[in-house]
Structure formats: structure tokens, C-alpha cells
Amino acid sequence: MDLIAQLACELNLKAANVEAAVKLIDEGNTIPFISRYRKEATGGMDDVALRALDERLSYLRNLEQRKEDVILLIDAQGKLTPELEQQIREATQLQRVEDLYKPYRKKRMTRAQKAREAGLEPLANMIIMQASAKGSALDAAAAYVNEEAGFDTPEKALAGAADIVAETVAEDPENVADLRAFTQNTADIVVEATDPAEKTPYEPYYSYDEPLRRIPNHRVLAIDRGEREGKLRVRVNVDGAAATARLGSRWPRRQGVFAPVFDAAIADGYKRLMAPSLEREARARLTVRAQTEAINVFAKNLEGLLSARPVRGARVLALDPGYRTGCKVAVMDETGKLLDHGVVYPTKPRHDVAGTKRELARLVKKDGVNTIVVGNGTASRETEEVVSEFIAEQAPGLRYTIVNEAGASVYSASELASQEYPDLDVTVRGAMSLGRRLQDPLAELVKIPPQSIGVGQYQHDLDQAELSRTLGHVVEDVVNRVGVDVNTASASLLGYVSGITPSVAKNIVAYREENGAFTDRRQLKKVPKLGPKAYLNAAGFLRISGGKNPLDATSVHPESYEVATSVLERAGVATSELSRGGVPDIEHRLGSISALASDLDCGTLTLIDIVNELKKPGRDPRDDAPEVVFSRSALSIDDLEPGMELKGTVRNVVDFGAFVDVGVHQDGLVHISKLANRFVKHPSDVVRVGDTVKVWVEKVDRDRKKISLTMVQGK
């Protein structure tokens, strides 16, 4: 197989660009580096396209290796024919290779194998070929009686030959492929309760069936979980008669004395040898499909969360609510440095509201706090009410917001947190994490395992290795899209930079602590274990503010400094201008970019990126994200009425809709049918985590604490 041609065809890309991308990947370059700094070679592929190519490349290479292995295994048995080898080599899917190998795979002794060893294969061939015979089928079988092997009567000999026919039919690759497609396209999934009287979350599935090809992914995952917990019984229902007839249609003229035997063998081959595995396979494919989509949804949600806009200039008082142990307080300056910490008790059992307000007033005045953050966990609603009252009574210029606590406890108790703040209590670390999530969500959330951030569906039921790999790619892509200040970034953040391993990230921090702040990107070459390849892949994503060269604070790669300097000269601008906000009118000064690219012997795509960066050096793409929604007064679910218009923040996106925080401590659901005034294939096509949206209350169930919202006015 020509891998380059195959990839180009499948992904609708130019072969030359595919070949260049594959070469760059094989040379050890990272996806973010190739996407950002090798656009001429790849034709401008973004990180999504490159990851798809890399994934498919791995699959096709594994496929080719498996083909070679299978060919060798069959050849070792002396059963490889030119036709079979050609079929294997032309296969484009691993499943097809395994289907072709199945008849030759070593397996435990089967009824058919036992019959073959007894010399009944010629009789089986007579059945398949519908050979003419004198007398009955039993008369023909009498010649193959083998008492020593246990086939001591014509009936047993004929049954043994039928077993060979059944296995031959069931293992034929074309039959398997055809019946697999038939099962996928026509079968139903049928679900029933193991105990219909028991109350469980799975009651909607107690008597449920739906075609395999139509069942939504979230239902598949719910049914899988219910089955795993022993609450549901699940089977795949296939029209066995139709499947058997379809199998038999390959031999349309079954006549003569062997016809009834052949018919029975085909039916047996399907029911006993094909149906169980095809039904298991159909369930497995359904689960893989659902899990793959769930991982993709999780990845999109995580990307939205990590790409949230930082709240710069915020001096934050963070409250991690609780009851018996009180609310933990952490006050941080604009850089996230801890200024104060303590505990207040606004909730039961102490319910010291007056004392809490006094302490808040003291800290706000002492530390110049302008923003309060409240975690959304236990006791959040009561804590928010006290904060709202405090602002109304004593600090009308103050603002507050609710922050998602998911993963904060995981971080605060982690080894990383104890290394960062060895002298602080776990509870203080947790409160600090909440405040820093507002100041710089990306820098704080990279310290937490992505699976713990809580923006997916059924994440604990998913393939954890695949989930971890996919989410790791998301974090890597966002970190490199934003860029990292090498003098302030934690080792956790640096570890996601292109070309930087976790151990090298720690070395960067150690070098910084020992030698002082980096003032030149070239100093990175002195960091232990940061070799030439790592420097090439990392340099453009590591920023140095206030260094010797203003270009070090931009996304311009050091390999392009000469071009960038020439561009500035053409524009009549000194490099020092970059430190004062860049050159907004640089495009007007330069004229034709394509002509300039030719003059400077630089690729047009690369030059466009350089010019855009010089226009606004160090621009943070997160500044395009929606602003954080702040409040000054608290709402509760009792305040909501149908028709009420609200502004909210998307907290989670799932297959069936989006959950929106409207400030009442219970996220409302916008069903997929109410996201837009048009057909929506998936909610992620309309919204993503972190979006600020306008919604209308449709229905409020106060007893069950459920809120139904719509994004379509008047719906």
C-alpha cells in the first residue's frame, strides 16, 4: 500500500503536503510545532488536521505490519495462495485482514476439525458442490464411516460433514462481512430490567428497544452502565430467518440429495457460529462509537474551559465553602501570590454571618480586594447569599462570581501542590486554586488531571488510556496556542509546551531559580537535557517579557528573526516598538505580502504569521473568549419563572444538550432541540464550554431542582 497516496485520498489532502507532514512527524517534531512553523510544507494544516493524519498514519502502519504477520502465519501452514495474498495486501481495514485470517487461525478442537481429521472433508465438499449421488445422502455418507474416530454410522458421518460445511460457510470472509453489515443495519438492541420492581436511574430502559443504527450515543453509555451494574439485561435482536436466507443466497440452486443437509448446515453455521460473535461485535462497535464520541465531546468541553478568558488585574478573595469546618479563605494579588488566608463560618452549625462580614470587610480593605470568588460545591448557595449581602451593605463596588470546584480537591491533596506550597494546609491550597482559576484558568487547570475537571459525560466508563491521550493533546494544543512565559510558568504548564518533557520542565524551573530570570531565548540551550531538537520545537512557544530582544516576547520563532527584522526595517519601525504595543498599521506600510515574501525568500504563510504577530506582539487568543459573568446579588431557583430572560455560562456540553449556569446553584438544561431555530446535529456545533449565552426559562421543577431553558426566544 502506498501510505502517502492512501492518506492523501482519505483526508482529501495534497500528496506532497502529506509526505512533508509524515516526514516531519517521523523526524520527531511535535504537532504544535509543525502546525505553527511548517505551514509551507504542510499546506497550512492546523493541529486538528495534523492529529487526524498522525492517527490515521499509525493505523495504516499497524495495518501493514499486521498484513505481513498474517501472510507469514498462513504461509507457514502451507496454505497461502497468490489470490489470498493479494486479498490480504489490498485490505484497507484491520477487520478485513482478521476476517481473511480467521479460517487459518489456530483454535481449540472444533466439531468441524474433528470431522476433518476423520476424513469427512470430501463428503463436505460433495454437499457444498451439490454433487450428484446414487441413492440418498445417507447412502453417500456410508462410504465415509470411521468407527475409530467416532463417526461409526452414516448419520454421524453426514452430521460431521455438515459441521465442516457450517464452519466453512461461517468463516468465509465474504459471508462474515456481509452478515456483519446486515446485523449493523437491521438489528435492534433490546433491553429489560433484571428486577422490574426496583427503583433505579435506569427505569427508562426497563422495557426498551431501538435499532442499532439509530440509538444515540448517550443512551448506549447509559445502557452499558446499567448492564455493568446488574440492573439491565441487554441483547441484540436479529431476524435469524432473514440472515440465514441471506447467507444461503450465495448458493441459489440447492437441489438434489444433499440440498436439505446443506440448508441445515447453513442455518447451523449462522446460528451457532456466526450470530453470537456478530452480535457481540455489534455491541462492541456500538460501545466504541459511543465512547469515541463521548471522548470527543469531553475534549471540546475541555478546550473551551482551558481557553477561557483570564481576568487580569483581579485582586481576589477566594472562598471554598463548607459547613462544619467553615469556609476557607485565600486572598491573592494580581499575580496569584498569596496575601492572606483564614476561615470564616457563615453557614450552619455556627452560622456566624456577622463575624464573616467583619472578616470580609477587613480583608477587602487590607489587601485591596476587588473580586470575590465562591466555589460551587457544598454550602455554596448559603455562602453566596452572605457575600451578596456583604456587597450590598458594605462594598457596592465589589463583584463576585461562582467558580467550578471540580478537581480542586484533587490538586490540593496532590504531590504537586505539596511541592508548590509545602507550608500551607490542604484547605488553603484548595481555596487558592479557586481564585487562580479566575485569574488564569489555563495556568491553574493544567495542574489537575484533565479527567478530574468534570466537563464530560460518563467519563469514568470510558477507555481511560484513550481519554487520557486525547485530553493530553487538547491541553498541549491550547497551551501552545496561547504561549507560555518562561519566567513565570510552573513546571506543570511548561511540561505541555511543544518539545518539553516533564523532566525538562522541572530543569527549566530549577535553572531559573538558580540563575535568575531568562533574558534571552538562547539561554534555554543551557538548560540540562534541552537539546537542539527540543529547542527547535519549543522556542517559539516560550516567551520572555522584558528581555534583551523584543522578539523573544512574541510567537516569532528564532529561526525567523532575520526575516522579522527585515520586515520591521521595510516598515520603517525599530524593534523596540514591539515593547510598546506593536505596529497596528504594519500591513499598510508593507504593501503586497506575496511580493515581500518573494523578496525575503520566505514562505507567504510564514510571513503572514510574522506580520500578524508584529501587528500585536504576544497577543493572547483567549482575549477573544467571552467575558466572565460577574454578579452583585444572589438568585435562587425560587426566583425563576417561565419566560424570564437570563444571561448564563455554558458549564457542560453533552450529546443531548448543554448545561448552563444562570447563577442559582443548579445548572439548567438547554435541550438540543432548543439550542437554535434550526436542526442541530450536535450541541457542540452551537455552543462550547465557557460561552456566555442568553437563555429563557421554560420550566422550573423546584422539588426535583430541575431547570429547563431555551435559547430560542418565544419557544
What residues fall within each predicted segment?
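A glycine-rich phosphate-binding loop feature that marks nucleotide/adenosyl-phosphate handling sites
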Residues: 181-189, 319-323, 377-379, 403-410, ...
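Low-complexity, acidic/Ser/Thr- and charged residue-rich accessory regions of DNA metabolism proteins
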Residues: 140-154, 207-211, 225, 235-237, ...
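Long, charge-rich intrinsically disordered scaffolds of nucleic-acid metabolism proteins
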Residues: 96, 100, 401, 407, ...
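C-terminal accessory/binding modules appended to enzymatic or scaffolding proteins
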Residues: 12, 309-311, 476-510, 632-670, ...
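Accessory alpha-helical DNA-binding modules that contact the DNA backbone or grooves
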Residues: 30-31, 46-148, 340, 481-624, ...
